[in-house]
From Swiss-Prot:
UniProt xrefs under InterPro entries: Ribosomal_bL34, Ribosomal_bL34_CS
Basic residues bias locations: 1-19, 33-44
Name of the protein described by the UniProt record: Large ribosomal subunit protein bL34
Residue ranges, annotated region (Disordered): 1-44
GO molecular function, one term: structural constituent of ribosome
GO cellular component entries: ribonucleoprotein complex; ribosome
PROSITE patterns for the chain: RIBOSOMAL_L34 (PS00784)
Pfam (any one): Ribosomal_L34
Family label: Belongs to the bacterial ribosomal protein bL34 family.
Annotated HAMAP family: Ribosomal_bL34
Keywords: Ribonucleoprotein, Ribosomal protein
Gene Ontology BP term (one): translation
Gene name per UniProt: rpmH
């Protein structure tokens, strides 16, 4: 059986990267929450 996780850096950035987070209101709220928490890395 094929494994479900097939890593790809391009796909990772497209779905979870900083630009994609900034493009939606919900994504911006995620970044704000991570800033508030003091995360070193905000996104992939």
């Amino acid at each position: 059986m094929k494994r479900t996780f097939q890593p790809s850096n391009r796909r990772r950035a497209r779905n979870h990267g900083f630009r994609s987070r900034m493009s939606t209101r919900a994504g911006r709220s995620i970044l704000a929450a991570r800033r508030r928490k003091g995360r070193v890395n905000l996104s992939a």
